[in-house]
C-alpha cells in the first residue's frame, strides 16, 4: 500500500464500443489480448498501448436478439501461437497470435433452430480447446465440446443435462440423470438448461 500514491495512468486503449466490457485480458510475451462486445478481438502492445491488430468475426447484428444479457464476451485463450475465442453466434475461431489472421473456424451449435450463443472464454488443455455455450434462458440443452487445437475438428461433446428419454442416452450419466427428472414435464422440449456459459475448471 505504500506505493499506491505513485500509481498513474500509463496508457489507455479505446475498444470502440460504448457497451460494457466483460473480458479478462491475457498478456503473453508483452502482448495483451482482450475482447470487446460483438466478440471483436484486440491485440495491444502491453507496454505502450499501441494496437497491433484487431479481428472482427462479423457476427450478424440481428443475432443479438438471441442473447439474454447483451453481446459481451469474456475473453480468449492463448496457446502455441494461436488465440482462441468464441463468437457470440456460436463459432469457435483460432487466430494467429502474431498477425490476427484466421487459422480455422468451426460451428459449435448443434441446432440452429435454438438460440444458442457463446459469451464465455474457451479453455485449452494439452491439444484440445474446450468451450461451452449460453442460451439456457431461452430453452436450449447445455453441453461442453472439445476441439483439436490445431485443426478445429470436434473431439468429443458432453451434455450437462439429459435429453429425450425416449431416445438413446449419450452415456450412463445421462441415463442416471434422466431418472431424476419428471418426464411429464417434457423438459427436453424446453431444452433442460445447464449451459456452461462462463469459466470452466478441470
Spans of model-derived segments:
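Aromatic (tryptophan-biased) beta-strands that constitute blades/sheets of beta-rich domains
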Residues: 1-15, 50-65, 101-110, 153-161, ...
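Repeat-blade elements of multi-bladed beta-propeller folds
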Residues: 20-40, 65-91, 117-141, 185-202
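Internal hydrophobic scaffold segments of catalytic domains
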Residues: 133-136, 140-163
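Short loop/turn segments that connect beta-strands within beta-propeller blades
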Residues: 45-48, 58, 96-99, 148-151
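A short, polar/proline- and glycine-enriched secondary-structure boundary/capping micro-motif
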Residues: 45, 54, 64-65, 96, ...
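Extracellular/periplasmic catalytic domains that process cell-envelope and extracellular macromolecules
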Residues: 2-3, 45, 202
Amino acid at each position: 500500500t505504500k506505493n499506491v500514491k505513485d500509481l498513474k495512468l500509463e496508457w489507455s486503449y479505446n475498444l470502440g464500443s460504448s457497451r460494457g466490457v466483460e473480458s479478462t485480458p491475457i498478456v503473453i510475451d508483452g502482448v495483451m489480448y482482450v475482447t470487446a462486445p460483438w466478440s471483436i478481438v484486440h491485440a495491444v502492445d502491453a507496454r505502450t498501448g499501441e494496437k497491433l491488430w484487431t479481428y472482427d468475426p462479423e457476427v450478424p447484428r440481428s443475432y443479438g436478439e438471441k442473447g439474454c444479457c447483451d453481446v459481451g464476451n469474456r475473453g480468449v485463450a492463448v496457446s502455441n501461437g494461436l488465440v482462441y475465442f468464441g463468437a457470440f453466434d456460436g463459432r469457435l475461431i483460432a487466430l494467429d497470435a502474431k498477425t490476427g489472421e484466421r487459422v480455422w473456424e468451426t460451428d459449435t451449435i448443434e441446432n440452429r433452430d435454438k438460440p444458442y450463443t457463446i459469451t464465455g472464454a474457451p479453455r485449452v488443455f494439452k491439444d484440445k480447446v474446450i468451450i461451452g455455450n449460453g442460451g439456457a434462458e431461452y430453452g436450449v440443452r447445455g453441453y461442453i465440446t472439445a476441439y483439436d487445437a490445431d485443426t478445429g475438428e470436434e473431439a468429443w461433446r458432453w451434455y450437462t443435462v439429459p435429453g429425450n428419454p425416449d431416445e438413446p442416452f449419450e452415456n450412463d450419466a445421462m441415463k442416471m440423470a434422466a431418472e431424476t427428472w419428471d418426464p411429464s414435464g417434457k423438459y427436453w422440449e424446453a431444452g433442460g438448461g445447464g449451459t456452461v456459459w462462463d469459466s470452466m475448471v478441470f
